[in-house]
């Protein structure tokens, strides 16, 4: 590649995300890191570059802050929508804390709880919420089910800050627990509850416990299948985004170790907000900050010598809107060369 000529060390990995664009088998790409390091800008820019080499790209935000709309200057929701100015790039914003009742209703109108008035109001929700993480797990499973039915060639996830990023790895276990609890409930009280539910109009959407069990099993199968794909380096990779500061580097190392323990491929780090002051720059603060950044950059290069480490400059203006995102995205595939 042309940018390889810019690398003085022949053995150094290319400091770009070009390898991700070249890997045509990739289906899932996660972009994650500490809050405020430029995850959304990076994921939007990566999706833009992917749209140049792939037939169809879907960008999904699972961050409750939902910055995709702000980044593109266009409102997105829980349904995939084409990004203005593109024919093969769509985006959607999902709430990972979507309610269990909405899922059970399968998109239908909210109905009065059939168990209300029997001293059992909200019982199904209480049961579900008693399992840690099940709400997010089912919401995520539902989204994956939607995504599977759509024909996107590659899906980019703009994830929530680090602490929540890796929850999807626990979803199969969470859903197994939920299924076991519901199975136990169904076997013990199924006939009685179905009888009560029948007299009260059933669960939302006219479902009974058997329908609920079937839905849970279907979601579990979907999650299990996708989880297998997540652990296949030919199909899935994780792009870490950070800044050259101690806390961000610490979070990145913790995240990479956790990804490795789960068998998730990661081989790229984007370091944002780097300063490149000129040698005769009189700004003491700029030079001091650059000195600090240089120290952590050296640590990153030493720790992750087998990673593609992309160095991105701190810009004088916000990266918002299609044109600025496209300009920023070019630096993900062509190494930034600071002015002399």
Swiss-Prot record:
Q: Which UniProt keywords apply?
A: ATP-binding, Cytoplasm, Endoplasmic reticulum, Hydrolase, Metal-binding, Nucleotide-binding, Transport, Zinc
GO terms of biological process kind:
tail-anchored membrane protein insertion into ER membrane
Q: What is its main location?
A: cytoplasm
| Enzyme superclass (EC) | hydrolase
GO terms assigned for molecular function:
ATP binding; ATP hydrolysis activity; metal ion binding
EC number, UniProt record? 3.6.-.-
Which residues span the membrane?
none
Describe the protein's quaternary organization and the partners it interacts with: Homodimer.
What is this protein's name? ATPase get3
Q: State the organism named in the record.
A: Talaromyces marneffei (strain ATCC 18224 / CBS 334.59 / QM 7333) (Penicillium marneffei)
